């Protein structure tokens, strides 16, 4: 890929827009599905839970989540208007259980202690003020709630050709340090590895990633 194409890819991974964004959203759903399902598993969803996902993409995984327990209520938020529209389109049959909210990326527009479970996959690289954002998540999570944060490890991510463009990368120690600066203190680290098709579409690669299960 040419440098300009890599920049466009990086921009659309952060905030998918238009027809290219829809294409990237489909690709992200496919390549991130393993990480997403591991994150959902780590949530240990229970009947009646109110769940928030930060950065829902095209939302094709929501059906899987809603099937895991009874009377779940899911809200997904995203900065991408394109993904917001696609997620609503892909989940019309779950309108009574799933809601999608467009937001500006920094202030989480919810009341204190709203959610039992919160999760996010591959978004932390784009947070402008990570500690403030973590504290915002802490604020809207109920006492004894669970927050799952999943990210590609630095030593894997830095080999990808598009991550030099506006990606902030972390290894496990750096992420632990970041979280320790927030109100969150209790966490469990689980390292994973999977083989996926690269986002440039040119090869299959082994991705190393971390699922952090953080309790309030």
Predicted regions and their residues:
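A short acidic, Gly/Pro-enriched loop at the edge of an enzyme's catalytic core
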Residues: 106-117
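A short glycine-rich, Lys/Arg-flanked "PGG" loop and its adjoining helix->strand segment in the class I
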Residues: 131-143
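Core SAM-dependent methyltransferase catalytic element
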Residues: 195-216
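Class I SAM-dependent methyltransferase SAM/SAH-binding core
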Residues: 50-107
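A short SAM/SAH-binding and catalytic strip from SAM-dependent methyltransferases
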Residues: 117-130
């Amino acid at each position: 890929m040419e440098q300009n194409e890599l920049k466009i890819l990086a921009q659309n991974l952060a905030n998918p827009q238009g027809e290219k964004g829809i294409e990237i959203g489909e690709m992200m759903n496919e390549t991130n599905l393993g990480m997403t399902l591991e994150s959902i598993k780590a949530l240990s969803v229970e009947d009646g839970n109110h769940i928030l996902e930060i950065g829902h993409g095209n939302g094709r995984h929501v059906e899987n989540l809603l099937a895991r327990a009874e009377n779940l209520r899911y809200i997904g938020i995203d900065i991408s208007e394109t993904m917001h529209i696609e997620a609503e389109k892909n989940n019309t049959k779950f309108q009574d259980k799933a809601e999608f909210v467009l937001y500006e990326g920094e202030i989480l527009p919810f009341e204190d202690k709203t959610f039992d479970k919160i999760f996010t996959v591959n978004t932390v690289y784009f947070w402008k003020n990570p500690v403030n954002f973590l504290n915002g998540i802490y604020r809207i999570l109920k006492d004894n709630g669970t927050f799952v944060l999943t990210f590609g490890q630095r030593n894997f991510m830095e080999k990808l050709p598009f991550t030099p463009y506006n990606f902030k990368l972390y290894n496990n120690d750096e992420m632990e340090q970041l979280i320790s600066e927030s109100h969150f203190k209790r966490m469990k680290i689980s390292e994973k590895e999977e083989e996926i098709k690269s986002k440039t579409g040119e090869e299959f690669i082994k991705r190393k990633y971390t699922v952090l299960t953080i309790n309030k």
